[in-house]
C-alpha cells in the first residue's frame, strides 16, 4: 500500500450514516434554490451515485465507463470548489478548513487516477475504490456539516450571488459538452443510505 493509499484509508469516515444524513439536511436547510450550496449538494449526490455505479458494474467495459463518469464529475466539482469556494473560506477566516479541503481533494483525485491503472474487476481495485469513497464521504460530511453552512451565514447576498455565478461557471467550463452526460448520473433518493452506497460485498 502506497503512502497516499495509507492517507486515504486513514480518513475512512468515522461518522455514522445518521450523522451524514443530519449534516446533509442541515446543509439543505441553509441552501437556497439555485444557489452555490444547492448546486454543491446536487453534485455531492451525483458523486455518491457515481461511486455506486462503479461498484455495481458487472464487466470490465461497464466498470471502465463508470470510472470515467466518476472521474468526470468528481474532477469538475473539485475544480469549481478549489477555484471559488475554498478561497471564499479562506477570506472568511477559515484558512484551516480551506487548506484541509484542498489537501483532501488533491489526495482523492490522485488516488482515483491511480485506481484506473488497476485491473477493473480485481479485488485490489474494489479495495482501493472503497478507500477513496470513504475519504470522499468524510470530506463531504465536513463540508455539509459545518464548513459550508457557516460560510453561507457569514457572506452577504451579493457575495452569495457571485459565488453561485463563479462556481457554476468553473464547473461548466470543465464539463463542457459532458454536462448532460453527468446529469445522467441520478442522485440517490433522499433518505437513502449515504455510507453504504458502494460498500463491498463478500465475494
What are these regions (language model features)?
Residues 1-203:
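Small-residue-biased structural context
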Amino acid at each position: 500500500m502506497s503512502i497516499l493509499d495509507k492517507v486515504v484509508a486513514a480518513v475512512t469516515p468515522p461518522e455514522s450514516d445518521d450523522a451524514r444524513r443530519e449534516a446533509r439536511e442541515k446543509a439543505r436547510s441553509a441552501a437556497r434554490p439555485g444557489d452555490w450550496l444547492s448546486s454543491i449538494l446536487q453534485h455531492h449526490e451525483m458523486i455518491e451515485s457515481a461511486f455506486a455505479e462503479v461498484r455495481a458494474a458487472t464487466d470490465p467495459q461497464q466498470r471502465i465507463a463508470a470510472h470515467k463518469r466518476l472521474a468526470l464529475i468528481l474532477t469538475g466539482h473539485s475544480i469549481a470548489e478549489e477555484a471559488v469556494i475554498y478561497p471564499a473560506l479562506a477570506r472568511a477566516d477559515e484558512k484551516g478548513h480551506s487548506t484541509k479541503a484542498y489537501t483532501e481533494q488533491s489526495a482523492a483525485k490522485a488516488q482515483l487516477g491511480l485506481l484506473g491503472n488497476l485491473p477493473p474487476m480485481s479485488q485490489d481495485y474494489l479495495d482501493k475504490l472503497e478507500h477513496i469513497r470513504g475519504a470522499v464521504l468524510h470530506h463531504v460530511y465536513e463540508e455539509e456539516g459545518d464548513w459550508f453552512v457557516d460560510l453561507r451565514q457569514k457572506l452577504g447576498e451579493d457575495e452569495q450571488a457571485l459565488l453561485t455565478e463563479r462556481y457554476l461557471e468553473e464547473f461548466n467550463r470543465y464539463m463542457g459538452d459532458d454536462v448532460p452526460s453527468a446529469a445522467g448520473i441520478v442522485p440517490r433518493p433522499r433518505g437513502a443510505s449515504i455510507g453504504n452506497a458502494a460498500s463491498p460485498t463478500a465475494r
